[in-house]
């Protein structure tokens, strides 16, 4: 496994060797796309890449197809966008702010707020997640000692309804960085990054979604309370690496393999967002550019 080469020398063609017994070789290339944003977002569908361009003069969404042709969409959203998801079943982009969730419809080109989803008890949204081809949205709040995440379902009339609250029961000195819902062979799990203020440590946990019981945990980093740790799940990739974890305060990526062993490797810039695209590319978003690392 030489996945380090994929990131450490992003301007050249590299060779990636998997840890299987066939000694297969894979070519790696990188495409750099300049695009500035003070608060970058990144989401992918099966064929498209969604990012934003937010500067003092511009506030717009940018849609790129698989050929990297750009379409610019002016955004009416005044609040900072803190998260985004691709809603595959309805072919819509979901955009999260601290108080609202918006949709962007690819057919109508309209951005509008989901009026049914409102923060409980005037809390502040932190992050959200969704299973592929599902009509359920999981939302977590930005607070210490978070006790649950909410599950919202969409009805036939396109209205949304709060259906369940799944337990988290964090300690009073803990908060989450992000959540990610995972479906492994019909096992529905929740991946979470958590900061503990007493130990001053970040950790990642895997929990059973319905019970909230943790069945896997790994320490990530210390002394970085101000910057959340995020993650992507490397399902169906050629490498043995299963998770990539990152923070915008660090130029190091934490890679976790199938045996839950960590490897640290450097990247040239602080990473704000990262996504897996079409099972053969890793896209990395910084404040100044989009790097698409593609291997075949």
Q: Residues of each region from the PLM?
A:
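Beta-propeller domains
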Residues: 13-22, 44-75
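Structural motif
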Residues: 56-63, 99-105, 125-126, 135-136, ...
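C-terminal closing repeat unit and adjoining cap/tail of repeat-based domains
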Residues: 238-296
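A short helix->beta-strand "capping" segment at the edge of beta-propeller domains
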Residues: 3-37, 65-70, 258-259
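Solenoidal tandem-repeat scaffolds enriched in leucines and small polar residues
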Residues: 123-207
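Loop/turn-rich, solvent-exposed surfaces of beta-rich toroidal or solenoidal domains
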Residues: 192-206, 213-256
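Hydrophobic beta-strand positions that form the internal "hydrophobic ladder"
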Residues: 49-50, 92-93, 135-137, 188-190, ...
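Repeated scaffold domains used in trafficking and secretory/extracellular systems
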Residues: 34-46, 77-90, 117-134, 167-184, ...
């Amino acid at each position: 496994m030489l996945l380090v080469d994929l990131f450490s020398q992003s301007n050249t063609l590299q060779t990636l060797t998997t840890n299987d017994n066939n000694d297969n070789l894979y070519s790696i290339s990188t495409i750099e796309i300049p695009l500035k944003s003070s608060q970058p977002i990144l989401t992918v569908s099966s064929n498209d890449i969604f990012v934003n361009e937010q500067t003092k003069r511009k506030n717009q969404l940018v849609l790129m197809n698989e050929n990297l042709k750009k379409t610019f969409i002016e955004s009416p959203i005044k609040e900072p966008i803190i998260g985004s998801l691709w809603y595959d079943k309805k072919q819509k982009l979901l955009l999260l702010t601290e108080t609202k969730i918006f949709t962007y419809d690819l057919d109508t080109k309209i951005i509008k707020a989901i009026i049914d989803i409102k923060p409980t008890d005037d809390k502040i949204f932190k992050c959200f997640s969704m299973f592929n081809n599902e009509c359920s949205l999981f939302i977590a709040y930005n607070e210490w000692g978070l006790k649950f995440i909410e599950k919202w379902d969409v009805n036939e009339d396109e209205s949304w309804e709060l259906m369940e609250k799944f337990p988290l029961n964090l300690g009073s000195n803990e908060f989450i960085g992000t959540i990610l819902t995972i479906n492994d062979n019909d096992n529905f799990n929740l991946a979470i990054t958590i900061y503990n203020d007493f130990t001053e440590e970040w950790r990642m946990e895997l929990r059973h979604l319905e019970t909230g019981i943790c069945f896997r945990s790994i320490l990530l980093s210390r002394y970085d309370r101000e910057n959340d740790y995020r993650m992507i799940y490397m399902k169906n990739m050629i490498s043995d690496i299963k998770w990539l974890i990152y923070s915008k305060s660090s130029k190091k990526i934490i890679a976790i393999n199938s045996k839950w062993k960590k490897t640290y490797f450097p990247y040239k810039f602080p990473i704000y967002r990262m996504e897996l695209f079409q099972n053969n590319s890793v896209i990395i978003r910084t404040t100044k550019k989009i790097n698409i690392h593609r291997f075949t």
